[in-house]
Design a protein with these regions (language model features):
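Phosphate/diphosphate ligand-binding glycine-rich loop within oxidoreductases
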Residues: 39-112
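Glycine-rich NAD(P)-binding loop of Rossmann-like domains
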Residues: 111-144, 171
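NAD(P)-binding Rossmann-fold cofactor-contacting core
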Residues: 151-168
Length: 219
């Protein structure tokens, strides 16, 4: 079995070592133009020239959760696409979102400005109930983020295509519930994949339906 590794801006050594250790009988290498066609591709944002040279690939392993760039390319017919659901990205996204939400809630930017200006001004925080967080997309990563935000006792709403049962998260389902979801959101977190249905979903109309003074976290 020949495995071709073609990942933009990704050091190949850890992947090659791991694949060779797990599959000692496989021929694993970094793809170079002119190489023989592979049976399996491990990729991240490969050039179209890579796919044009892979007529027999049976499986494509995308080393990230997002496959929108991949789906925009001409891929080998019949190849199965496998993407990572989490692989460590969940906790990174959760900590990023929680850091941002708490920063807005505690007015860290204003406090930092005051410190730089030599001003001491006490700030009384609003109750957490005034800061509902709305998560768009409740897949593996979205659920991880929603649960993390919950630990800080903020109200959490979630919007998804199909019903999701996450304890403590108020669910809004489908296009008919989207505007209601936005109206109940002060911090909007976007974890939706880029598809024809979600492209440009963040627009003037969408943002105008959020609570006044809302924030958007696009991850």
């Amino acid at each position: 079995m020949k495995i071709a590794f073609c990942c933009t801006n990704t050091p190949p050594e850890p992947w090659l070592l791991g694949l060779r250790a797990a599959l000692p009988g496989a021929d694993v290498s970094v793809w170079q133009p002119g190489d023989a066609p592979a049976d399996v591709a491990v990729v991240w944002m490969p050039p179209q020239a890579f796919w044009d040279a892979q007529p027999r690939v049976r499986a494509i392993f995308n080393i990230g959760a997002g496959v929108d760039a991949l789906m925009a390319q001409r891929l080998p017919a019949g190849a199965r696409i496998v993407r990572l659901d989490d692989a460590g990205m969940g906790v990174q996204m959760a900590e990023y979102v929680c850091h941002a939400v708490i920063g807005y809630f505690r007015e860290w930017a204003a406090i930092d400005h005051d410190i730089r200006a030599g001003i001491w001004q006490a700030r009384e925080p609003e109750p957490r109930t005034a800061w509902p967080v709305g998560v768009m997309g409740l897949g593996v990563l979205g659920e991880r983020v929603a649960r993390a935000v919950q630990t800080f006792e903020f109200p959490v709403n979630g919007w998804s295509r199909s019903p999701k049962a996450i304890v403590g998260v108020r669910g809004f389902v489908g296009p008919e519930a989207f505007h209601d979801f936005l109206a109940h959101t002060r911090v909007l977190v976007n974890l939706l994949p880029l598809t024809p249905e979600t492209e440009n979903i963040l627009n003037r109309d969408t943002l105008s339906r959020l609570r006044p003074g809302a924030f958007v976290i696009n991850v």
